[in-house]
Amino acid sequence: MEKIQNVLMKYLMPIANKLEQQKHIQAIKDGIVASIPIIIVGSFCTIFLGIANLLGSGPVYDFLNANMGVLTYASAFTNDMLAVYATYFIAKTLSEKYDLKGSQPAVTALVVFFILCAVVKDGQLSTSYLGSTGLFTGIVAALFTVEIYHICYERKWYIKMPESVPPMVQDMFAALVPLVLNTIIAVAIANLSLTFGKVAFPQLIMNALAPAVTGMDTLPALLIVMFFTQLLWFFGLHGPSITSAVWASFAIAYAAENIAAYTAGQPVQHIFTFGLFYCILCVSGSGLTLGLNILMMRSKAKSLSSVGKVSIIPGLFGINEPLIFGTPIILNPFMFIPFVFGPLICTTIVYLTMNLGLVGKPIANPPGFLPPGVSAFLMTLDWKSVVLVFVLLILQTVFYYPFFKMMEKEELQKEQALEK
């Protein structure tokens, strides 16, 4: 075990640290995460539609059906405009990392994004790419725009006004050069894409990323994500915070597509969404530790019992850092196998049950800090998802049990030695 830990520490830690420190990757992750509250609000609109579908008939159904346009109205300005908000947040985050003041870089990123997505049909501007289909274009627009700003300011390629001019006016003129450069380049790219690629730039990006977009929503991809998430946690690094830099943009795009499909009465396609990760795969926290928490509460070892009692309330709401650091699970040889590999078995069960249609796929993106089963039901509007959550927790508890007993035995021996 020690040799394995040393090898992983040697090769895995440098990569994880670089991912944590890389500005662009972190800007994408933070920007996507900042967009999630908007998706949560928009996804609640689908709950009204789901309730109507569950009822089938009756006065409540008639009321919901008659007012569905009003009840789902907000969805058009939240889920259906996901790429707009993500573009702004990503650009804003990256500009802050470069110490660029004000909101001008983020607003310019929106200008670039709209130019790249501009498709005129019958004299009207299409909104086709403002949602999940334009998300990757938004990422490109945000990163590109801020880089242009950074280069311009670093090399002093901007209009510098006398110090007697008010700061607001100085900032306005300073932003002109990078704004003009970004606009010219965006117009050129958009027209080149339409002229030579015969498609809008967002579609060109989607075509190029098609293998990755399709491949991320598969069982092997999910298992890889979960494995590295748990492994990083085991070594004391915040697993989801690091791995989400890779998968967050895909997961939130899948969620938006599912919500849009369900609202339109079409089949829901995707399994791997932000909601799935936090509401089911990490229910009660990474490693599905609620069962372990209960075992620790009932432990004869005082140290484990006290940690279990302190951790139970946060654990019910998906926060298990007190348990991870208090036990500790980090670098604990007894916990390596159940904490890292147990969730992989649970992930396989979740994917297969949803893929086979035994449990409904995600149609909403509720917050993951609700008690076990609650967020899963809100995410799928399927009571079987609640059963699935408790089956997973029981299974993971069984998986933890023999390793917990070994850990408890060692802790009892330590406590008895101290008492002597």
Q: Predicted regions: what is each one?
A:
Residues 23, 83-97, 107-111, 264-334, ...:
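Alpha-helical membrane segments and immediately flanking helix-loop junctions
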Residues 102, 119-220:
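Membrane-interface helix-loop-helix junctions at boundaries between adjacent transmembrane segments
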Residues 17-159, 330:
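Early transmembrane hairpin of solute transport permeases
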Residues 23, 27-48, 136-144, 171-193, ...:
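Core transmembrane alpha-helical segments of multi-pass membrane transporters/permeases
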Residues 180-299:
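Generic multipass alpha-helical transmembrane bundles of integral membrane proteins
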Residues 60-73, 202-209, 267-273, 295-306, ...:
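Short juxtamembrane and helix-loop transition motifs at transmembrane-helix boundaries
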Residues 2-19, 61, 65, 259-268, ...:
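Transmembrane alpha-helical segments and their short flanking loops
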Residues 41, 83, 87, 91, ...:
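Alpha-helical transmembrane segments in multi-pass membrane proteins
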